[in-house]
Amino acid sequence: MNIYLVQLSWQILRYSGGFALPLQAESKQLTKRMMKRVMSMLACLVMAVSSMMAQSDKIVGNYSVVRNGVTSKVKVFKHGDGFRAQVTWVDNLKKEDGTLRTDEKNPDKSKRGVRADQIVLIDKVTYDAKNNVWTNGKIYDPTKGKTYKVKLWFDGDKVLKMRGYIGPLFDTSEWKKID
């Protein structure tokens, strides 16, 4: 079986222009039927990869979030090798004294001046195609100034569920996709 795959790969490279080698007697046995099979397998591979990529990008978009009585909008986008979620709008951006709300509980003092409508909530999540979830990242809770592990998944087409957890303790919330 392995020899067949090696020969097939070699022949694909030669016929696709990968190598400019003279045809040998064994390669002349490659028939149109064999080429159709090879092309069909390549087409299936391309479709499978593109389908998986489309599924991983399903998380990208804008979401409405209601948490602790505060409504906000969050944008999820590709960032590096994973995805990031950042606040883009908060319904109560100004405090009662007229000053802007900031990330004042952030343990990193250099980030305490970040406006509430610019806080990065989720970072470095990646798609796990086997389990149809986004994991391996962190979620930040600006109300507590704490960061947790995170797992995200869809419940239907428009509801993104996320679970922030530390060991066996977790909290699950929902974001509603608005575009």
What is each model feature region?
Residues 53-62, 170:
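N-terminal helix-cap/turn-to-beta initiation motif at the start of protein domains
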Residues 137-162:
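Acidic, glycine-rich flexible loop segments
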Residues 42-49:
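Bacterial N-terminal signal peptides
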Residues 160-167, 171:
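Short, exposed beta-strand-loop hairpins at the edges of beta-sheets
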Residues 32-41:
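Bacterial N-terminal signal peptides that target proteins for export
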Residues 60, 65-66, 71-140, 147-148:
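Central antiparallel beta-sheet cores of small beta-barrel/beta-sandwich binding domains
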